[in-house]
UniProtKB/Swiss-Prot annotation:
Gene3D superfamilies: Ribosomal protein S10 domain (3.30.70.600)
Organism from which the protein derives: Pyrococcus horikoshii (strain ATCC 700860 / DSM 12428 / JCM 9974 / NBRC 100139 / OT-3)
Entries under NCBIfam families matching the protein: uS10_euk_arch
Function: Involved in the binding of tRNA to the ribosomes.
Any single Pfam family the record assigns to this protein: Ribosomal_S10
One cellular-component annotation, GO: small ribosomal subunit
Family: Belongs to the universal ribosomal protein uS10 family.
Keywords: Ribonucleoprotein, Ribosomal protein
Protein name as catalogued: Small ribosomal subunit protein uS10
GO terms of molecular function: structural constituent of ribosome; tRNA binding
Subunit structure as annotated in this protein's UniProt entry: Part of the 30S ribosomal subunit.
GO biological process terms on file: translation
Domain of life of the source: Archaea
Length: 102
């Protein structure tokens, strides 16, 4: 049987966990085997900018950081389960990738 590998990514952990829990509930209802959600390493993007626009004065900096959280879910690619997964309402800050693996 084919598997579906679902990759979730978001800057908001709560909305990411909500979507992962919805997928878990669908798997339990339809009776398909599922592994995950497996937390992948969080990507931290750091940007340091100079506060002073003209270069004069003391060198003070602003530090900004963006964290991207990721989860990986493997699920059997049952037609009924996949249709329900496609109907999940996904928040704007969560991206989903679904890949079929044989």
């Amino acid at each position: 049987m084919q598997k579906a590998r679902i990759k979730l990514a978001s800057t908001n952990v709560r909305s990411l966990e909500e979507v992962a829990n919805q997928i878990r509930q669908i798997a339990e209802r339809t009776g398909v085997r599922m592994s995950g959600p497996i937390p992948l390493p969080t990507k931290r993007i750091r940007i340091v900018t100079r506060k002073s626009p003209d270069g004069e004065g003391s060198a003070t900096f602003d530090r900004w950081e963006l964290r991207i959280h990721k989860r990986l879910i493997d699920i059997e690619a049952d037609e009924r389960a996949m249709r329900q997964i496609m109907r999940i309402r996904v928040p704007e800050d969560v991206t989903i990738e679904i890949e079929l693996i044989s």
